[in-house]
Amino acid sequence: MIFPNIDPIVHIGPWALQWGPLALRWYALAYVVGILLGWRYAVMLVRDAKLWGGHKPTATPLQIDDLVLWITLGIILGGRIGYVLFYMMLNEGQRAGLAEHPFDVFKIWEGGMSFHGGFLGVCAAIVLFARQQKIDMLKLGDLIAPVAPIGLFFGRCANFINGELWGRETTHPWGMIFCNETIQKANQGGCPAGHLPRHPSQLYEAALEGVLLFLILNFAAHKLKWLQRRGALVATFLICYGLFRVSLEGVRNPDHGMPNFPLGLTMGMILSIPMLAVGVWLLWRALREPVPPPLAEDHEPA
């Protein structure tokens, strides 16, 4: 299969939405759509009284509205800082480039975001917002956990559209050749992925980290009522994401220029294994804590 010739810049008819070096790209649009849909879904969760057993929800819809800005900043700042620290600083070529042009750190429009950095940025945003609003930060994390896969799904789809983060070479019939006119134009006539079929690992991640993780977390929220069990949804997110990411690292192409880690580990594995470990501990603790009994009458949040 040949990778479809999709321009990473969004077009309306024949017009590209571009102003000099700045352009509206599918990757940026994926962030916007993911955040907006996640915001509305979080408000829906807060307003669904059945999920809270008659107790007051963790946050109000107005607080969710305010939290969106904090989370957006956490995603952008954390994602970029994480990419610089976890990848650029360990890549000899990129590290040398940063030494010559340190302000390249701020060129987010040229690409380079880390999920794990964005995850830590969102965690920081939740902690700071929870302290300001005097909300239990772990319960606030439980509210955000079922929402996160929405953004992950759109982000991985955008990775696919960009023709980046492709997988290892494969002989499977769904293997894809990540080479087309757009990619050649952006890489001085070459195709970084070569001309052999590769795993479309971006789509694997969209399916597991996006669709399947969304279904698991929302089953836990709606059927198991785990929004009432402090820390359980955060734990489920950490465990599932850690498992999915570690398993998919086997088909993702290794990051170019990164050092060789022991035991065949990749940076994605190194950053995901602690998530898995913390998630197991959190779930063990959450399942031991008693759940407040449901109230006689459901509380309908404003």
Curated annotation (Swiss-Prot):
UniProt xrefs under Pfam families: LGT
Pathway membership: Protein modification; lipoprotein biosynthesis (diacylglyceryl transfer)
This protein's UniProt keywords: Cell inner membrane, Cell membrane, Membrane, Transferase, Transmembrane, Transmembrane helix
Record InterPro entries: Lgt
MF-aspect GO terms: phosphatidylglycerol-prolipoprotein diacylglyceryl transferase activity
Keyword Transferase attached: yes
A GO BP annotation: lipoprotein biosynthetic process
Binding residue positions for a 1,2-diacyl-sn-glycero-3-phospho-(1'-sn-glycerol): R156
Lipid bilayer topology: Multi-pass membrane protein
Gene Ontology CC, one term: plasma membrane
Family assignment from sequence similarity: Belongs to the Lgt family.
Function: Catalyzes the transfer of the diacylglyceryl group from phosphatidylglycerol to the sulfhydryl group of the N-terminal cysteine of a prolipoprotein, the first step in the formation of mature lipoproteins.
Name by which UniProt lists this protein: Phosphatidylglycerol--prolipoprotein diacylglyceryl transferase
Organism: Caulobacter sp. (strain K31)
Lineage, highest ranks first: Bacteria, Pseudomonadati, Pseudomonadota, Alphaproteobacteria, Caulobacterales
